[in-house]
Amino acid sequence: MRKLLDKLYKASGFLAAGFLVLICAVVSAQVVLNLITKIFGTAYSFTIPSYADFAGFFLASASFLALAYTLTRGGHIRVTLLIQTFGRIPRLAAELFSLSFGALMSAFATYYMIRLNIESFGFGDLSFGIIAIPIWIPQLAVSGGLAMLTIAFVDLIWLTLRAGRPVLKNMDSE
């Protein structure tokens, strides 16, 4: 089970990185097309329809798919100034409280995002723009990212309880 979860977190991180590459590709292609228009005039004026919409969808996908991977690698911002003064038991309690609160909030967001996803699919909602995309498609990555984050929080709660100490390390301390 541990290997499966780690592979899921990595896959989510790789998907997020892939969406960042897509943002770079779409925006770079549009910049090149703008340069061609500038150099050769409006006779060679080309544009990628809805490129800003696509870049926005890719950004939302990358952001939410990266959450679980970043959390499990200790990359999220953590306030250690206060908790480093705690003893072992209060620090463990603070860690479990924050992980549990994160899991509850993430589960809440996941539930309602999936409901929104289903409604968007059912109503046939489309994005605004030159190319109308069924909005449930980009919402799917957000739902998946939130679901992965919820799983990661529950996983970290379990690992913390089993270890009897906080298991997350800050990336800046490595």
Q: Which residues are covered by each model-predicted region?
A:
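Alpha-helical transmembrane segments and membrane-interface helix-loop junctions
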Residues: 1-174
